[in-house]
Design a protein with these regions (language model features):
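Cys/His-rich zinc-coordinating "finger/knuckle" motifs
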Residues: 18, 24, 41, 87, ...
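Extracytoplasmic/secreted cell-surface and envelope-processing proteins
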Residues: 52-53, 79-82, 135-136
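Surface-exposed ligand-recognition segments of extracellular binding domains, strongest
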Residues: 64, 68-130
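Extracellular disulfide-stabilized recognition modules
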Residues: 1-39
Length: 143
């Protein structure tokens, strides 16, 4: 089955590429689709990568309505939500057994709504992007 229409592609000088596909689906479906195409859901190590990803997603969105894009942000059933941490106890799920950064800059701790407090349920989060008043876009993680 062919992939959904690709909305945008952006590659870094270091060789990593991000692509956004517009489709309605669950976290598991998005992760599986990325795996089929030898990729993985995006993860962000710092502000430069975040700016790159936000630019790509802004290019992919159409209209002022908020859009939610699945990224590799997940909380295992054995981890607790932690309001003191930027990612609130969530961590980056990396395709192919790679490792994501453990230290996360505070600037990445922007949530549209605080995630549900839990120590027993696996949870997933995406990156929500919305048109901001006066131009530009607002963003935040959202369960």
């Amino acid at each position: 089955r062919p992939p959904p229409p690709r909305a945008a592609v952006l590659c870094q000088a270091a060789g990593a590429c991000f692509s956004a596909y517009l489709a309605n689906g669950s976290y598991a479906e998005a992760s599986s689709a990325c795996s089929r195409w030898r990729g993985g859901l995006a993860w962000v190590s710092g502000e430069p990568e975040l700016r790159l990803l936000l630019g790509l997603l802004a290019e992919a969105t159409a209209g002022p309505a908020p859009s939610l894009f699945w990224v590799g942000l997940k909380k295992s059933a054995f981890a607790c939500t932690d309001a003191e941490q930027p990612l609130r106890g969530f961590s980056w799920e990396v395709a192919g057994g790679g490792t994501a950064p453990r230290e996360v800059p505070a600037a990445l701790g922007r949530w549209v709504k605080e995630p549900l407090r839990s120590c027993v349920t696996a949870r997933c989060a995406g990156l929500q992007l919305a048109a901001a008043p006066g131009g530009g876009h607002s963003w935040g993680w959202k369960e």
